Amino acid sequence: RDDVESRGLGDVYKRQDKYRTLKVRTNADTPEDAKRAKELGAEGIGLCRTEHMFFEGDRIKAMREMILSKDEEGRRHALDKLLPMQRGDFEGIFEAMDGLGVTIRLLDPPLHEFVPTEEADIEALAKAQGKTVDQIKAIINGLHEFNPMMGHRGCRLAVTYPEIAKMQTKAVIRAALNVSKAHPDWNLVPEIMIPLV
């Protein structure tokens, strides 16, 4: 907000608001981004990319645990760790937008984007997973694709691993319900986008 005001754009935006007929939404992937966007006049979020939420601390560890799991039970165990983190992010985003529309896109990129590439990180992951470095490298190599844009991602990922989409959908709906209970005057309707259909 200070940037906008210091550059004299605040008055420009206010004048434009008198004449425009379009609503302006923003891209925001964190509660902080959403809050800043709202302060700058955004009237909702047009795209919240959930994959950006997975790259921090314990989240990336749980995401990698899910990717490296050999069966659905292992994936569900890792996803159970991610569920409260995702729900908390969505609650923060809904709160920041004060009941305005929020479109949340379910996981889109291929899984290889979440695995480490540096040798030290691969070694640490192998140790944490109780696997050898060669086993981890084999899994990572198996995830890489010739053309990731047309490969195993988006809705195709959700078909192969429906538990991922289920966890994210559950997180969105629970967050919306929790925020709606706290703000019964808001007409909070979460918008869920299925990627790359």
Question: Predicted regions span which residues?
Answer:
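Single conserved hydrophobic/aromatic residue that forms the stacking wall/gate
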Residues: 2-13
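Conserved alpha/beta-domain cores
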Residues: 14-197
